[in-house]
């Protein structure tokens, strides 16, 4: 039986069985609460597990949705169904404002920021008179359909789990899209994502707001199920509980959110009843138990519990690739009259250290130029200056006649500059072809709504056809459906080249592409690069393998201590005394 069939049968049983009279209402009510919590956890899977942004304040967004609906329905007589879009809009606007500030933080400052506004929201909910102050809001009307009030746990069960089902589908569709791959790239760091055109701040804000809107929907459901609100349900401790659900279930797994929500909600109910009896005194002992549980899971199953469950299910089928689909168009071919890339007096400092000092050289159209030098010579720093990751402090960098030394990596990528990295930057859990498809990010246009509704399928077919063509070009078509993390280091470097080629660049920057490759693989790579040159693409390559460089490059530029000490044809550079002294240690 396929994984899809198992999922459909399980979902059908899950939706029908709780409606049977033989199932106690207590358990149905518990499942209602699990569904509400699962909505928040799904958002946290996208935000934290996939996007790498830890949030302890997600309960505040549940509160925004709940209190908006509570105030509108009790104070102004608005229908709960009309209050739903208002609740989601208020939550979305609040997330947009808070996210515009918060998502730009990095490291431990981001979770600290979420704690700060989580505490602030808690005090707002508990002190504003319109929200009932510390007494909260009571007598919130229940949902109704066609005059039938959804009072009781069984009717509400249907509403809650329809919402959860739609949220799961939307989240899965989002992750299987151009935008979803960009979100996954965030967790690996901004440097690689920026290099193939992902707008980091915008992408972070999109997933932040989407996760908040799911929490706002959960708040709306909670308000009309509980029918009373108090600020205590939306404090930082509740936010930590939601984060625990995502981590326990599997922080990067959508179905893990359901598993984590179920496990934590049931355990909380059981522990709140039994632990006070065990200790002979009342108290929040379940928090201690959850702390122990979290430590145990982080030690024994760092990816959460869902991957353990997934191993018992049939293997997921590989994504079908329509190689006949038309490839995505690249940027217009750039053939300037002068050099394609020109550096003039480029200088880069890090504090008192001058990493690159007044370097000048040019790369012509259809030319392979190698940049060599001992470790610490400034080669990768120069690459970062050209690609906009670490802009030059002084000097000029021109591409196709236009200055780019102050442009962002995204804008430089749009001009037709692609690069690889000294330290491989792939997403290990994604397949090879999905990693390569990231390189075509700039050529797609589908946004959040199109991704969730699967209106982007034609664009996706073209993106994956482009990725498949580039994998075939570099000789890795047979590995396209393997997880990138399963490849050898040398193969990973070639995958990075295929990803860069998906941009269809005019200039390709390669940082140590032959490292980790066997001799035959190096020969094959050299043939690929010669083929690119024959088609008019320019290549600037940093490499330590002198045999590889000497047999490939048209010209070689040599750096030492951040300064250019030689430039010329391979034979000329090889015999240069300064190069022999600096790069080869004086050995003739």
Where are these regions (language model features)?
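Transmembrane alpha-helices and adjacent helix-loop boundaries
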Residues: 1-325
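The feature captures the beta-strand-to-loop junction immediately N-terminal to the Walker
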Residues: 372-374
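Helix-to-loop junction immediately C-terminal to a conserved catalytic motif
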Residues: 387
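Conserved ABC transporter NBD signature motif
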Residues: 395-404, 414-415
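Catalytic Walker B motif of ABC-type/P-loop ATPase nucleotide-binding domains
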Residues: 508-512
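A short, surface-exposed alpha-helical micro-motif characterized by mixed small hydrophobic
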Residues: 549-551
